Amino acid sequence: MDSSAKIVKPRLLHGSQWGYIDPVDTPDGGNVGFHKHLAISTKITTTIPQKHLINWLKNVGDMKLLMEISLDSILNNTKIFVNGYWVGIHNSPIELKKIFLYYRRIGCIPIMISISWSYPDNIIYFYTDAGRLIRPVFYIEDEERICSLEYYNETYNSLSDLLYGTTKRKKKINDTTFYDYEELYNKDEGKSIIEYIDVAETSFSLIAMQQEDFKETIHTHREIHPSLILGIMGHQIIFVAHNQLPRNLFSCGQSKQAVSVYN
């Protein structure tokens, strides 16, 4: 789209960009809102063959393929979509989501695969395709859980521990590979505390900003730190939360001009 086009909506900051796109690092003038930069913790997914997920859903998740069912079964069960394709149905969506999240949180399922359950439509969506933005958050299994990196500093010594737990593994985990539980573990000890979620999964989650929010309502996740909504240049701004937006925006642009390409 031409930067001279006088159109407002493509330039606006959309709510789905929270945590994924830096809200202050964008140029002024005609390109405002067109040129975007990732938040500092955002990753971009790579392709994971959907046939591997479909096989897992059938063999471990107990999903019924469309070719195996009758019309009556379709009407009375939860539909399963993978990358936009309707592949099967399931009669216990709560159990399917629970076992999927468990396997993903111990590394038996690639962390880049997302799950989102649309309750009104009774559809579970899975995405394995490339180009999706994902970001890390604390996941919450019970309201008593303390979501703080400082609290877990003595136990979790690496990003791998945070994502997959502290249980001793038989082999190094590949982020794009499916595993059987027996391939990786002999027993289940320390759980992971962080998982990556994409925009689709975020839409069906309730994410708390801080630990105190748990007292008001039930949440599914908690932010690691509010500053993670900013990108690299946004983190260079002094007292970013105390400045008006144009000052922060100018700071990002002028800081880029001041830094050599060799830095």
Predicted feature residues:
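Conduit-forming functional cores of very large proteins
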Residues: M1-N263
